[in-house]
Amino acid sequence: MQRINREESFRAKEERLKDLFVRGLSGNNAAYQTFLGELSSYLRAFLRKRLIRLPDEVEDLVQEALLAVHNQRHTYDPSQPLSAWVQAIARYKLVDLFRRRAIYEQRNDTLDDGMDLFSSADAEAAEARRDLNKLLADLPDHFRLPIMHTKLEGLSVREAADVSGMSESAIKVGVHRGLKALAAKIRGAL
């Protein structure tokens, strides 16, 4: 029921706009002015749905579409629905907007922004590495070596034991106690 009413309402609007437009094409200026006023409301709603994230562009695009309708009015075929013709023009204007924005964003996207991102990440990593090395340097070898081999170099407990000449148990205990000592040192520094 509601769908039928909506379709009837749409058809009535279509017929009204078409009548105003055809009368305007015949030289009736008042009908043409009314047509442009009503069409602008229709276009505004049509474009607002499609430009949810760019609401500031809606009014400009409405004006561009109205101008295009006016300039291309001689191409309208009265045997065809007016709404399809107007929507095609509005869609072309919408595509033009997206192209303009893409070109603008492409031209104005600086390469330096990407470099700053990586350089700051590198600088932060270097600072963290320096701070960690400073903290580890204060630990005795039986704590420092197990942490460096297992946590920083990614060796297994067995591999760390082989490299350092310590037992596997000593590696596990050294890591545990070394991390505990580092945590206490960091807490004391704060």
Swiss-Prot record:
Region (Sigma-70 factor domain-2) residue spans: 34-102
Pfam families to which the protein is assigned, alphabetical: Sigma70_r2 (PF04542), Sigma70_r4_2 (PF08281)
One GO location term (cellular component): cytoplasm
DNA-binding region: 157-176
BP GO terms, sorted: DNA-templated transcription initiation
GO function terms (MF aspect): DNA binding; sigma factor activity
Protein location: Cytoplasm
Record-linked Gene3D superfamilies: 1.10.1740.10, Winged helix-like DNA-binding domain superfamily/Winged helix DNA-binding domain
Superkingdom as given in the UniProt entry: Bacteria
Protein keywords: Cytoplasm, DNA-binding, Sigma factor, Stress response, Transcription, Transcription regulation
Region entry Sigma-70 factor domain-4, spans: 130-182
Physiological role: Sigma factors are initiation factors that promote the attachment of RNA polymerase to specific initiation sites and are then released. Extracytoplasmic function (ECF) sigma factors are held in an inactive form by a cognate anti-sigma factor (NrsF in this case) until they are released. Regulates expression of only a few genes (Dsui_0154 to Dsui_0159) in response to (hypo)chlorite, conferring resistance to reactive chlorine species (RCS) during oxic growth.
NCBIfam families: PRK12536.1, PRK12539.1, sigma70-ECF
Name the record gives this protein: ECF RNA polymerase sigma factor SigF
Organism name: Azospira oryzae (strain ATCC BAA-33 / DSM 13638 / PS) (Dechlorosoma suillum)
Gene: sigF
